[in-house]
Amino acid sequence: MERIAQKADGIDFGILGVATLDEKDDLQTIKGIGPFIAEKLYALGIYTFEQIGNMTSDIEEEVNKAIEFFPGRVKRDEWTKQGRELHKKK
């Protein structure tokens, strides 16, 4: 996970927002995120539905690359839309 964490510098947390481990949501609630991907997101500093809901297209691609996921998968699985909806339900 250290290799993944080093890629966090390429992600704009000014847009995503900053969260801590204490604030983490169960990201596996989002379709397309399993335990291994959730751990990779946590390693990047992405802990909450709100952060995922704040992703722009560019950030989706950066996250996709950082977690070494199939190209376009974050967008195709609509993580941003799901993150927004789950954050509103909290």
Which role fits each region the language model picked out?
Residues 1-31, 35-90:
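C-terminal extensions
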